[in-house]
A protein has these predicted regions:
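Lipid interaction determinants
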Residues: 22-144
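C-terminal motif of bacterial Sec signal peptides marking the signal peptidase cleavage site
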Residues: 17-20
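Sec-dependent N-terminal signal peptides
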Residues: 8-15
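Bacterial N-terminal signal peptides that target proteins for export
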Residues: 1-8
Length: 144
């Protein structure tokens, strides 16, 4: 017969092991974390494109999303506009349903507060989370 101490130790290890792995593995892991832009349309940074509304050449240098556990987020982007250094900031709320994350901005430095979505995935082995956002056919790929 197992001692009470052995049973309690086994139970603690089982609960601890399940808790430690629950939000880092599988397709439906929690989305909170810090995401750094890696590629745009599979092209590394810096990434340049022409803004159709202004005709200016924009070059993205970096972009970082911070998704907080309280459901708020911030986005900080550094870019050049026809060679002049500039930045973009956005903040708001985020929600998650499975692998889909919805961003609802309440502030945008360009005054665009239209909600948009991203797809999240998690690596069960490395714990790395990835996020892809499709902005009008241009796919921005981020990782933690």
């Amino acid at each position: 017969m197992m001692s009470r101490r052995t049973v309690l130790m086994a139970a603690a290890l089982l609960v601890g092991g399940v808790t430690a792995c629950s939000d880092l593995t599988g397709a439906n892991g929690r989305a909170d974390g810090v995401y750094y832009l890696q590629t745009v349309n599979n092209n590394g940074l810096p990434f340049s494109y022409v803004d159709n509304s202004t005709g200016h050449t924009l070059t993205v240098l970096s972009d970082q999303y911070v998704l907080n556990t309280d459901g708020t987020y911030s986005d900080q982007q550094s870019y050049t506009d026809n060679g002049a250094q500039s930045s973009y900031t956005e903040s708001g709320n985020w929600s998650q349903s499975g692998t889909l994350v919805t961003f609802t901005p309440f502030f945008s430095s360009t005054n665009n507060t239209t909600a948009y979505q991203a797809t999240i995935s998690n690596s069960g082995y490395s714990g790395t989370k990835t996020m892809s956002v499709n902005f009008s056919g241009t796919v921005w790929y981020y990782s933690t």
